[in-house]
């Protein structure tokens, strides 16, 4: 098999621990999956079961009518009246069976669609509530695979697999009872083939299950690569890495193809082996059945009925193999789905959390420590306070802990040590909704959703009027370029706002944040993507709009934080300097050096 060529950033497409799930098949997990059928136990489910019972009963009756009554009584006894009656009865039963099958398929499809809808809704809702650490450890592609592909793979299991399993088990039980009733000796003779069937099933079961697990893993890897390749197409083309990317994709695609081929090859082995076992059973039936007829132990009609039932015996067994494969595929997917559903948020809200309708915005950090992993601390006993309505700027090299502080204020992560307070209340005591609803964040990498510009600005406050949206846009200088667009605020923008410039996207994010009317605004290098002319426009707007609000500014351009009430310089997670712009310049420390370096670069 061709292996995916790994190089550069593509090496990140590995099988992380959350992708490798090796749990044995167990009924507890199946019952958990079937719990999603529970809401329909009084509606669609009983109707489906009724059609199963009717269809199974009809199938079991027809061979007896044909063999014992048509052959042994009507034809052998030359009773034409009985023959005509039996023909009408059998024809009516076939029509009834057809109607039962149509209704069963219809209702089971409805049930399957309901269950898939509920399961996908449950999974998506759960993922929405997980903490940022969960998303740090997984690619967007692998998450999409769980929500889309893995749940889709359960659709056939719910629409046909489970009901077919029930149908086949009922049919098998009925056939075995009737076979022993017709001829215990002949039944026992035929049953000698069952050990062969058992051996085939047990030997293939584990191999087939592992094959479908591999298929799911390869699909996840393929989807992850596709997702990132599409999102990063501009970077790929800018660095002329198309050939390398295509070569890597060819390897990943080949691995996916090989995994499917191996799984289907093992699946394909099952049915022919069942048919071979069926042939052996048929040979036993003909040989021993003929002997019993000649000895007048059974009649020809019983023999014919027996032949019908033998076919009905092996047919569900053959299908059980197929249903079992569906179960294996479903288990492989459900394990991955439940692995997500069992994931608990790292950031949890207390049962009696305080819900503050309005906060003033005073923020304090008291000996706060934090680390993203065990290897390196991101913050070392950081302490500071921000009076309500004032502006704090965070400065430092990449990895100094600036964004970490912003994330902790919004409680996207919980501090490993120390206490963070807002208005004197530990943020762990506040409800997440009341905390985050009063904080607006503007990031350097602005995310624009598919929809209109109006809808994007209104995202954080859905009930805002059009006038309020326009007022917020005017305040940050976004109204000027929006009004120049053909459709204005009704202009449709694609995912991530690709038709807009970086500066325009940033202005929309400013308007979005300000429309929410927060007590606290966090600007995470929010002006880094804005040109100098646009920056001048928004600086004046920010002075007005930040008045009366607490602001935390993470600065890349130090010129944007001159007017900050206080500046903290961070280095490797430690607070090194603190003061306003003039004080830090006079100190001649790290901040003064950064300002001098940026000024020199600007002159050059």
UniProtKB/Swiss-Prot annotation:
Coiled coil: none annotated. PROSITE patterns: ABC_TM1F (PS50929), ABC_TRANSPORTER_1 (PS00211), ABC_TRANSPORTER_2 (PS50893). ATP binds at residues 396-403. It is found in: Cell membrane. It comes from the Bacteria. Residues 45-329 form the ABC transmembrane type-1 domain. It is a multi-pass membrane protein. One of its GO terms (cellular component) is plasma membrane. Pfam families: ABC_membrane, ABC_tran. One of its GO terms (molecular function) is ABC-type transporter activity. Residues 363-597 form the ABC transporter domain. PANTHER family: ATP-BINDING CASSETTE SUB-FAMILY B MEMBER 10, MITOCHONDRIAL, ATP-DEPENDENT PERMEASE MDL1, MITOCHONDRIAL. This is Uncharacterized ABC transporter ATP-binding protein YknV. It comes from Bacillus subtilis (strain 168). The gene is yknV.
């Amino acid at each position: 098999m061709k292996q995916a060529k790994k190089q550069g950033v593509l090496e990140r497409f590995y099988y992380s621990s959350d992708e490798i799930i090796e749990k044995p098949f167990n009924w507890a997990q199946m019952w958990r999956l079937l719990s999603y059928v529970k809401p329909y136990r009084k509606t669609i489910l009983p109707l489906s079961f009724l059609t199963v019972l009717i269809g199974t009963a009809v199938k079991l009756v027809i061979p007896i009518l044909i063999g014992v009554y048509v052959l042994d009584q009507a034809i052998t006894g030359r009773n034409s009246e009985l023959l005509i009656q039996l023909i009408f009865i059998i024809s009516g039963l076939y029509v009834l069976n057809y109607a039962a099958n149509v209704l069963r398929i219809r209702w089971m499809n409805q049930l399957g669609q309901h269950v898939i809808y509920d399961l996908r809704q449950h999974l998506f809702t759960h993922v929405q509530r997980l903490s940022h650490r969960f998303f740090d450890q997984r690619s967007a592609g692998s998450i999409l695979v769980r929500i889309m592909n893995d749940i889709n793979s359960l659709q056939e299991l719910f629409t046909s697999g489970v009901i077919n399993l029930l149908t086949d088990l009922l049919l098998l039980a009925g056939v075995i009872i009737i076979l022993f009733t017709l001829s215990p000796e002949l039944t026992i003779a035929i049953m000698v083939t069952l050990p062969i069937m058992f051996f085939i099933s047990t030997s293939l079961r584990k191999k087939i299950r592992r094959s479908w697990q591999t298929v799911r893993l390869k699909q996840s890897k393929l989807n992850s690569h596709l997702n990132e390749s599409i999102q990063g197409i501009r970077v790929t083309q800018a660095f002329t890495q198309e050939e390398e990317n295509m070569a890597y994709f060819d390897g990943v695609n080949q691995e996916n193809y090989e995994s499917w081929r191996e799984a289907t090859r093992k699946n394909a082995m099952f049915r022919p082996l069942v048919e071979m076992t069926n042939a052996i059973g048929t040979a036993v039936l003909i040989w021993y059945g003929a002997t019993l007829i000649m000895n007048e132990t059974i009649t020809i009609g019983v023999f014919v009925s027996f032949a019908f039932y033998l076919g009905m015996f092996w047919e569900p067994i053959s299908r059980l193999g197929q249903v079992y494969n569906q179960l294996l595929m479903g288990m492989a997917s459900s394990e991955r789905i439940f692995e997500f559903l069992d994931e608990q948020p790292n950031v949890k809200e207390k049962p009696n959390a305080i819900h503050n309708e309005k906060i003033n915005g005073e923020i304090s950090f008291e000996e706060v420590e934090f680390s993203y992993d065990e290897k390196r601390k991101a913050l070392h006993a950081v302490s500071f306070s921000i009076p309500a309505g004032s502006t704090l700027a965070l400065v430092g090299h990449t990895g100094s802990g600036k964004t970490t502080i912003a994330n902790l204020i919004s409680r996207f992560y919980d501090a490993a040590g120390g206490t963070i307070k807002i208005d004197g209340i530990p943020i762990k005591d506040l409800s997440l909704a009341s905390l985050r609803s009063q904080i607006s964040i503007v990031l350097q990498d602005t995310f624009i959703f598919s929809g209109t510009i109006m809808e994007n600005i209104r995202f954080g406050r859905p009930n805002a009027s059009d006038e309020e949206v326009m007022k917020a846009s005017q305040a940050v200088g976004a109204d000027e370029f929006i009004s120049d667009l053909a459709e204005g605020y009704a202009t449709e923008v694609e995912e991530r706002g690709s038709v807009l410039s970086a500066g325009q996207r940033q202005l929309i994010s400013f308007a979005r944040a300000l429309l929410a009317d927060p007590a606290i605004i966090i600007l995470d290098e929010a002006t880094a993507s804005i040109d100098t002319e646009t920056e001048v426009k928004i600086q004046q707007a920010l002075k007005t709009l930040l008045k009366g609000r607490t602001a935390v500014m993470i600065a890349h351009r130090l010129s944007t934080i001159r007017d900050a009430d206080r500046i903290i310089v961070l280095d490797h997670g430690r607070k090194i300097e603190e003061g306003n712009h003039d004080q830090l310049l006079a100190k001649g420390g790290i901040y003064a050096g950064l300002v001098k370096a940026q000024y020199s670069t600007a002159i050059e």
